[in-house]
Amino acid sequence: MFTINAEVRKEQGKGASRRLRAANKFPAIIYGGKEAPLAIELDHDKVMNIQAKAEFYSEVLTIVVDGKEIKVKAQDVQRHPYKPKLQHIDFVRA
C-alpha cells in the first residue's frame, strides 16, 4: 500500500495551479462518500515515482492531509501532452 503526504490547497483556479506546477507540485482532488470534496496539492516527483507502478491504479492508497489519513483510489490522471509531467489527479474515497 502506498502513502502520500498532501497539503490542503489554499488557492484555486488556473493561476494558482500554474504556480503549483512551477513549484514542482500539482493539484488534485478527493471526492466521494458523504464528505465534501477536498482540494489538495501533491509533490510531483514523489507521486511520479509511485504512479509508475501498476498497483497505484488498482490498490487503495492512503493520503495523509493535516495528520488525517484518507483511504482513496486513483480515479483519473491527467498528464502533460508531451512532457513526462502529471497535471492533475482525481481520487475517490474508498
Swiss-Prot record:
The UniProt GO MF terms for this protein read: 5S rRNA binding; structural constituent of ribosome
Any one Pfam family here would be Ribosomal_L25p
Task: One GO cellular component term, please give it.
Answer: cytosolic large ribosomal subunit
Q: Which InterPro entries match?
A: Rbsml_bL25/Gln-tRNA_synth_N, Ribosomal_bL25/Gln-tRNA_synth, Ribosomal_bL25_short, Ribosomal_L25_dom, Ribosomal_uL5_bac-type
Q: Which UniProt keywords apply?
A: Ribonucleoprotein, Ribosomal protein, RNA-binding, rRNA-binding
Give GO terms for biological process.
translation
Subunit comment for this entry? Answer: Part of the 50S ribosomal subunit; part of the 5S rRNA/L5/L18/L25 subcomplex. Contacts the 5S rRNA. Binds to the 5S rRNA independently of L5 and L18.
Q: What does this protein do?
A: This is one of the proteins that binds to the 5S RNA in the ribosome where it forms part of the central protuberance.
The entry assigns this protein to a family as follows: Belongs to the bacterial ribosomal protein bL25 family.
Q: Which HAMAP family match?
A: Ribosomal_bL25
Q: What is this protein called?
A: Large ribosomal subunit protein bL25
